Structures are given as structure tokens and as C-alpha cells.
Amino acid sequence: MIIARPRARFAFSDPVHFIALGFGAGLSPFAPGTAGTLLAFPLWWLFGGGATDEPLLLLAVLAFLFGVGVWACELTGRHLGVSDHGAMCWDEVVAFLLVLALTPDDPWWQAAAFFLFRAFDVIKPPPIRQLEMRIKGGFGVMFDDILAAGYTLLVLAIVKRVFF
């Protein structure tokens, strides 16, 4: 059975669903991936905006969140009947947290990062779309957004290098 549009009841029925649906952001009737990406901002600020002297700790936390996402999206995708359901937005949350971790702590850079990330996540330039079609399950759900984050960071690095 395929659940076309999950409701709050589904999200709250299992902690795994709640995580995969980005703490409910994926229930947004309009652009759930964008809602999930926006969720990364308050989470980033809640955790101190990366203000740490331990970059390896930050990397470890992001790797842990990625692993949780693989697990949560795998199970939730099975329960929804679609392996990469649009309501699952934990992938956007984690990938954009990675972008925020490597983006200057400036609202203009973060806004640019947000729009670039959303563009790359939606457009899926090569090889993102090809890999998304080949790599299935929770890992595939999470991985294509990490690639979109990589494209975002590459463009930001080029802009910073060339213009600033």
C-alpha cells in the first residue's frame, strides 16, 4: 500500500517516522523538502551554530545523523510504500547542516547556500540523478542530498575565491 500524503498521525505513530519526516516538516503541503531544509537553521542555532573547537566532533555528529537518516528513511520508505517519498526530508536537514557547518557564519552566505542547495536538490545535475536512480533504500535517499550539498559548497567556494 502506498501512502500518497502522510498525516500527523503517521508521523507520530513511530519515532522513526517522526525523524524521517523531519520532525513533521515533511508534512508541509507545500514544498516539504524546502521545509526540511529550513528546519536545519534552528537546529544549527540550537547546537551553537558550529561554535566548537572540535571540528571532528561536529563531523562525527553529522555522520551519526546521516546514519540515523539511512535507518529512518529506509524503514519509513517501506511503511509509506515509496523508497524516496517526498515527505521524507531528514535527508535535506542533514545535508544542509553539513552546508551550514562549512559556510561562513553570515546571513548572506547562508541565504545563498540555502537557495543553491534547494536548486541542486531539485534539479539534480549529473551525476546526482543517475546515482539517485541506482542507489536505493535509505542510503540512496540520504546520499543524493549529500551530493547536492557538495555542489552547493563547491559553488560557494568558487564565488568566495573569485569575488571575495
Where are these predicted regions, by residue range?
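Short Lys/Arg-rich amphipathic alpha-helical segments
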Residues: 28-47, 57-61, 65, 76
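Juxtamembrane boundary at the C-terminal end of a transmembrane helix
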Residues: 156-164
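Alpha-helical transmembrane segments of multi-pass membrane proteins
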Residues: 44-45, 62-71, 95, 100-101, ...
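Residue-level signature of transmembrane alpha-helical entry/exit and packing/kink sites
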Residues: 17-18, 37, 54, 58, ...
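Interhelical loop and helix-boundary elements at the membrane-water interface
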Residues: 2-37, 70-99, 119-150
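Mid-chain, well-packed structural core segment of small domains
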Residues: 87-90, 100-101, 105-116
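Membrane interface segments of multi-pass transport proteins and intramembrane proteases
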Residues: 47-60, 81, 128-138, 164
